[in-house]
Design a protein with these regions (language model features):
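Hydrophobic/aromatic beta-strand elements that line small-molecule binding cavities or substrate pockets
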Residues: 7-9, 36, 62-69, 92-100
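Solvent-exposed residues in well-ordered beta-strands and their adjoining turns
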Residues: 10-14, 51-55, 68-71, 81, ...
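Intrinsic-disorder/low-complexity, polar/charged segments enriched in Ser/Thr/Lys/Arg/Asp/Glu/Gln
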Residues: 2-8, 45-47, 60-62, 75, ...
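Hydrophobic ligand-binding cavity/cleft-lining segments
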Residues: 1-45, 51-53, 141, 148-152
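A generic structural micro-feature
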Residues: 1, 40, 55-61, 86-90, ...
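Beta-strand/loop substructures that line and gate deep hydrophobic ligand-binding cavities in soluble
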Residues: 82-129
Length: 152
């Protein structure tokens, strides 16, 4: 099943600070919902394990992420894939763009992914809703981290 998602978030920091935090494994681990481990194996590669629950399906996804087209502090592209065992798989990519706006940084993202296995059988609406909630939670946590205030 194909999935796309776009969005933008206004962050209270410079592009340089936002870019650095987007590449900091400790910040990402703290902000990604369900993230159990996140290891930076090179400046452009991460491996992670995250627990995910979508409807009745729970899974631990193990995956790898690669950063390409790095253009600090303007953005980059992300590609990756994750294996959730019998629950299924996810693979895809995203572009992330950082622009100065209103004394801070506007982060714009565009995600394209393929999902298979039991997760794909749950239906587009449920999967898209869960993906949107996960993205919203990540950016709420990330915005709190960038601004130096604790996440709710």
């Amino acid at each position: 099943m194909a999935m796309t998602m776009t969005g933008e978030v206004q962050l209270p920091a410079t592009r340089e600070v936002v870019f650095a935090k987007l590449n900091d494994p400790e910040v990402l681990k703290a902000c990604i919902p369900g993230c159990e481990t996140l290891v930076m194996s090179s400046p452009t590669e991460f491996s992670a394990v995250a627990a995910v629950k979508i409807g009745p399906v729970k899974a631990r996804f193990k995956g790898n992420v690669h950063l390409t087209d790095l253009d600090p502090p303007n953005g980059y592209k992300i590609s990756g894939e994750g294996d959730g065992g019998v629950a299924g798989f996810a693979k895809g990519g995203a572009s992330v763009t950082l622009t100065e706006k209103d004394g801070g940084t506007l982060l714009t993202y565009n995600v394209e992914a393929q999902i298979g296995g039991k997760l794909a059988q749950l239906g587009q609406r449920l999967v898209n809703g869960a993906a949107k909630k996960t993205a919203d939670d990540f950016f709420k946590n990330f915005a709190a981290n960038v601004s130096g205030t604790p996440a709710a």
